[in-house]
Amino acid sequence: MLIQFLLFKYLYPFPNFMQDSYNYLRSTYTNADANMWPVGYAKLVRFVGFFSHSDTLLVFVQYLCYHCCALYFFFTILDLTPSGKWAKATIFAFLFLNPAILYLSNYITSDVYFISISLVWISQLFKLIYKPGRLLLLAHLLVLLLAFTVRYHALIYPVISITVIVFCGVSVRTKLASIIAIITLISGFIYYTTGQTGKVMGTRQFSAFSGWQMASNAVYAYAHMPVRPVITVPSAFAAVHQRVTIYLDSLQHIPMAFRPDRPLMAFYLWDPGSPLQPVPGAAHIADNKVHLERMAAVSPLYNKYGKYLINQYPLQYIRYYIWPNMLQYANPPAENMSVYNDGADSVWSIAQTWFRYKTDKVYTVSDKSEMRLFDYYSAFMVFIIILFTGVWIAYLLIGGRKFTAPAFRQAFRMTTFYWIVHFGFSVLASPVVLRYQLFNMILGVTFSILLVDMYLKRARLG
């Protein structure tokens, strides 16, 4: 692990940055308790900064954190069912020799930190199935709250946790106490964050991000409709709809392949040229406090505007946003994972300030050509989904219940339930990209390999 890290840092002396990075660093620098993105990761960066502002130390902490959590997950999986050497070796290799994790650890984003927390979260749920206890439940509550502070994708985690707790082998009293504790903790966090968002961003709401995401998704679908009838919108939406209409009219003569909003990404959310931006052309949006406050101020309106467009064109929304995003869930684009520093040779001032760089210039020893590997991870995700679906079908056809351990059966069902809920949430919430799918990849590979190993053993035994 250490040799792998040292070699990588020789090739990439500086971390990888993208737009999200600078918002996290601004939250870190100001010690904010609310911002456009959740601030849990910023608290980790600030904690590391208490010891040193070295970017290498931060990257190493992220890398080490993942490996510790992955080890916990690995040994938890081994407790679920006996497995062959090849199965253990394959799962171990995917967990600890996966280049995606190495490169993602070098990003100043919450991704690898959230994956680490998620590995502990789901491992605890597996343990609750076959070895429930009050201390484990208490630890799980803390991990669940931690996940909630780091990524909004954790909104589905309480649903999964409560479902498992309902069916785990503890007393009814303990179950009720745990469920009430989860609801209380999460509600308290939402209430606190809502208040802090009002203080920091000027508008009281849990997440300014959600309203913008709703509008972005709706406008993306609206923009890709071949014919857009002229509609009279409510007066509250008149100004923003006029900007959207004028902008979309300007794209009429641009071939789809060259349109800035062609890929299903976050163009309408973050691009300075987006007609949704309060001030078009604003620079460094993610670290522009005044602009972010303006974005937060219109977020409630944009939430309603997005819902209005969806209600006006529900079938078109399904066709031009939901359906493409469903396909993107199975075949996620590499996005920032195949690019270093968004293609730039410099970083924003907040990164230079926090990491105490002498200049804003960054460089790599590598020619970065190997990063194109992540373009093929999309095909790998398709393969994993097909494999996972295949082992599930085989499990049903050959009566998997008869030859699998009870703990494994429960964990397998729980993982499937998680994946179904995650699929629904992800497709509806925002455009899916590769870094959001790495945790799912780990789960898919792990359970597929374990089941294939069981099937092979059963075949040998006749």
Language-model segments: what does each one mean?
Residues 103-114:
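Short acidic/glycine- and proline-prone juxtamembrane loop motifs at membrane-interface regions
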Residues 206-354:
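Membrane-proximal stem/loop segments at transmembrane-domain junctions that anchor or position
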Residues 121-136:
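Membrane-interface transmembrane helices that cradle and orient dolichyl/undecaprenyl
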Residues 10-24, 32-48, 52-56, 206, ...:
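Extracytoplasmic catalytic/substrate-binding loops of multi-pass membrane glycan-assembly enzymes
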